[in-house]
Amino acid sequence: GGQPLQNKVQLKGRDLLTLKNFTGEEIKYILWLSADLKFRIKQKGEYLPLLQGKSLGMIFEKRSTRTRLSTETGFALLGGHPCFLTTQDIHLGVNESLKDTARVLSSMTDAVLARVYKQSDLDILAQEASIPIINGLSDLYHPIQILADYLTLQEHYGALKGLTLSWIGDGNNILHSIMMSAAKFGMHLQVATPKGYEPDPSITKLAEQYAKENGTNVSLTNDPLEAARGGNVLITDTWISMGQEEEKKKRLQAFQGYQVTMKTAEVAASDWTFLHCLPRKPEEVDDEVFYSPQSLVFPEAENRKWTIMAVMVSLLTDYSPQLQKPKF
C-alpha cells in the first residue's frame, strides 16, 4: 500500500480491543474526530445522523455507569440504535459457544461493545465476528477510558507531547491502557504501585520498548511521592476492581499512603491536574484534590461520550472531521 491521501487515517471495519494495536497517528485521529463531533454537536448544535440505520450490540458481564450511558446516548445521538444485554440475556461462552454468538451478532448488529471478565473472550469474538468488536473494559485493558483522558488533557494543556503522567495506585487495566499509548504521544510515565500490585510484566516490557522508540521515560516505583515528583497529571483509580471485592481488607492495607492529597500535589509540577475515571472512593483521593479547580474528573467523564462517538463513527463510517486538526 502507498501513502494514504493527505493524512486520511482509515479505521473503518477495525476492532478496538487494545491501544497496543493502534499507532499514535491512529489514536490522534480518533481524538481529532472526538473534538470535531463535540464542536459540531455541542457548540454549534448540529444534528449529525452519521449512524442512521445502524445497530450496536452492547454485552455487559459487569455493571457500568459511564460506559453504558456514554455509549447508549452517544450512539442514539448519531441516529443509531443501541441494544443493551446483561448476563441475564446473554452469557458469553455459557449458553452457546463464543463462535456461535459472534456469528449471530454479526448478522444482526453493525458493531458490538463488550464489557467482559476475560480479554481472551474479546479476542475470540473479534476473530469469529465479521463486524467491529470494541472493548468496553476487560481484566487487562480499558482503552475507551484512556481516549477520554487524552482528549481532556489536550483540551486543558493544548497539547500532549512532553507531559509527564504520574500514576499512583493499582497496576490495573486503566494503567495498562495508558502504558500502551502514552509514549506514542511523547508523554512520560511515572508509576507507583504497592509491592505485589505492579502492572503486568509483559505490558511493562512493551511500554519500555515504546518509550525507547519515542524518546520518552517510563519508571516504576513503590513510592507514591517519587512517581508524583514533577508530574503534570496525577492519576489514580479504584483500588478494588470489579470481581476483587473479597480482597478489600488486604488491598486497603496494601494501599496505605497511596491517597492523593495536596501533599502529593506539592511535589508535582506547578500546572498539575488530576484525573480519575470514577467511581471514586475518598480513600483514593481526598475531597480537597478531587473537588479542586485542578481536578478534571467531570470534563473527563463527559468526554467518555464524545470519544466513544468518535470510535463508532471511525469504525462504521467514511466521515472525515471538518474541524482543523488539534495540536497533540
From Swiss-Prot:
Carbamoyl phosphate binds at residues 64-68, 115, 142, 304. It comes from the Eukaryota. The keyword Transferase applies. The modification N6-succinyllysine is found at residues 44, 54, 62, 118, 195, 205, 212, 248, 263, 281. One of its GO terms (cellular component) is mitochondrial matrix. Transmembrane segments: none annotated. Pathway: Nitrogen metabolism; urea cycle; L-citrulline from L-ornithine and carbamoyl phosphate: step 1/1. The modification N6-acetyllysine is found at residues 44, 62, 118, 195, 205, 212, 281. Its main location: mitochondrion. It is found in: Mitochondrion matrix. Negatively regulated by lysine acetylation. The modification Phosphoserine is found at residue 107. Keywords: Acetylation, Amino-acid biosynthesis, Arginine biosynthesis, Mitochondrion, Phosphoprotein, Transferase, Transit peptide, Urea cycle. Acetylation at Lys-62 negatively regulates ornithine carbamoyltransferase activity in response to nutrient signals. One of its GO terms (molecular function) is ornithine carbamoyltransferase activity. The active site is at residue 277. Catalyzes the second step of the urea cycle, the condensation of carbamoyl phosphate with L-ornithine to form L-citrulline. The urea cycle ensures the detoxification of ammonia by converting it to urea for excretion. Belongs to the aspartate/ornithine carbamoyltransferase superfamily. OTCase family. This is Ornithine transcarbamylase, mitochondrial. The lineage of its organism: Eukaryota, Metazoa, Chordata, Craniata, Vertebrata. The gene is OTC.
